[in-house]
Design a protein with these regions (language model features):
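Activation on beta-sandwich/Ig-like modules and their edge loops
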Residues: 2-146
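Extracellular low-complexity, O-glycosylation-prone Ser/Thr/Pro/Gly-rich "stalks"
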Residues: 140-167
Length: 167
């Protein structure tokens, strides 16, 4: 993807209650400005299958330093989590919400990624339907719910296929 750094979700947690967060990792030796990135999501059962419901921008001028992470945490998370957060939001997954790291501008109306108006860099879940309480991950039933997912150390970029990412 021209202009996009290979950022990806390095950690995703649905720790019960509001102890939810995700981490985006910058595997490069450059500081990455997040102005052209966003995290788009659907809540459980999507309104339109395959299309995001909310497009969430990072604060203008937000960056991820080289080989560092940017943490987005739920507004009501435990203080320990909030102290690590670069951004807070009430729109974090409870395990059954599809989350994508995207590069590009927000379309005027929610649009399928095949439109070419933005690029998916990585997934936690997908926007293709209600998974119940969560998606299965590496043989763990509903692994995105009430678990913390940590990417393997040798992963250096996101995966545009949730099926591949989930193992």
């Amino acid at each position: 993807v021209y202009g996009a750094a290979p950022l990806f979700f390095s950690e995703h947690s649905d720790g019960g209650g509001f102890n939810r967060y995700f981490e985006i990792y910058n595997p490069t030796s450059d500081t990455v400005l997040l102005d052209d990135y966003a995290w788009a999501r659907v809540g459980g059962n999507p309104t339109t299958v395959g299309v995001y419901e909310t497009w969430n921008l990072f604060a203008p001028g937000a960056v991820i330093l080289p080989h560092d992470v940017y943490v987005v945490a739920h507004t009501n998370a435990d203080g320990f989590i909030l102290n690590q957060a670069n951004m807070i939001s009430q729109l974090l997954s409870n395990g059954d919400d599809g989350l994508a790291l995207v590069f590009g501008d927000e379309p005027a109306t929610p649009t399928h990624p095949d439109s070419g108006l933005y690029t998916i860099l990585d997934w936690v879940g997908n926007w293709n339907g209600d998974p119940g309480s969560g998606w299965d991950v590496a043989g763990v039933s509903e692994g995105t719910a009430n678990h913390t997912l940590v990417r393997k150390c040798d992963v250096m970029m996101g995966d545009t296929s949730w099926t591949n990412s989930a193992g």
